């Protein structure tokens, strides 16, 4: 029962259009019922499932829906060695070309600060990746890394070889990428809008998610989430904290020191609390 809801998201952590995992009958039901109910449908898919044949079948049932692709990085080296994604940027480009051929909306997911990357490198890379996919994506969703228990990144975090991103890095990323999304300095809905940039820090403000010193986190997270709706840089006006200088110094040092994993230290709490953090 989707009464009162305009949008239906079907995320399978893989692909709704994967016939070996998802019965074709269920795929057809999702596509047809959302179309008949007039609901905006967003499905997740890997690149290899987005063939012309599959998309022709899907659009014959539901001619208007959005496909979300977890690209993570527009960089083959990062895709292979940092996130073990299993496809290349060429695969992504080919999938997007097919989606555009059938007039299907594209939502691209990018990862901010994947493992084995410093904060400064992550900041430089993400802006390049946004620029690379902006023209071909209706929406770009940047997901800052957060620590999930039992994963490799959890082990690195416990060994102090990885720290989740600073919230200030996300703010800086938005400022640097804004002109890519809005070449004339506009906001969401303006004629100059190339794509829509969405940033939603999972566990934002917590030690296992993107965080600052603890004093300013709530305010900064709220501003980031407001920007995703408005696309207006004024959301960040007047937001400041003493920890911003620490962030600046860390970024500066990482740009001039041979520290491939970065130098970021815990921003708050003692070692025991960091290890016990949820």
Model-predicted regions and their roles:
Residues 1-22, 33-50, 64-92, 139-143:
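Core AdoMet radical
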Residues 2-3, 31-35, 56-64, 97-101, ...:
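Acidic (Asp/Glu)-rich catalytic clusters
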Residues 42, 77-85, 111-121, 156-161:
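Surface-exposed cleft-lining segments at the edges of enzyme active sites
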Residues 90-151, 171-201:
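Conserved C-terminal portion of the radical SAM core fold
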Residues 146-278:
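Auxiliary Fe-S-binding modules of radical SAM enzymes
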């Amino acid at each position: 029962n989707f009464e009162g809801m305009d949008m239906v998201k079907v995320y399978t952590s893989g692909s709704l259009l994967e016939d070996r995992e998802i019965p074709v009958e269920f795929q057809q039901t999702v596509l047809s019922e959302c179309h008949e109910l007039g609901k905006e449908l967003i499905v997740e898919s890997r690149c290899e499932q987005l063939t012309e044949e599959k998309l022709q079948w899907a659009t014959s049932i539901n001619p208007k829906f959005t496909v979300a692709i977890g690209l993570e990085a527009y960089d083959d080296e990062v895709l292979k060695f940092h996130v073990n994604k299993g496809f290349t940027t060429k695969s992504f480009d080919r999938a997007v070309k097919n989606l555009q051929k059938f007039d299907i909306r594209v939502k691209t997911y990018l990862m901010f600060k994947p493992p084995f990357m410093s904060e400064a490198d992550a900041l430089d890379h993400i802006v390049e990746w946004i620029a690379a996919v902006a023209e071909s994506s209706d929406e770009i969703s940047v997901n800052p890394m957060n620590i999930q228990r039992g994963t490799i990144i959890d082990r690195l975090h416990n060994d102090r070889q990885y720290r989740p991103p600073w919230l200030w890095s996300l703010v800086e990323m938005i400022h640097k990428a804004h002109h890519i999304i809005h070449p004339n300095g506009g906001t969401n809905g303006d004629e100059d809008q190339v794509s829509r940039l969405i940033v939603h820090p999972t566990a934002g403000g917590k030690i296992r998610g993107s965080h600052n010193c603890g004093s300013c986190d709530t305010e900064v997270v709220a501003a980031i989430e407001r920007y995703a709706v408005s696309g207006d840089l004024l959301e960040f006006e007047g937001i400041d904290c003493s920890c911003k200088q620490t962030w600046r110094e860390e970024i500066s040092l990482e740009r001039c020191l041979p520290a491939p994993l970065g130098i970021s230290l815990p921003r708050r709490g003692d070692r025991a609390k960091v290890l016990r953090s949820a």
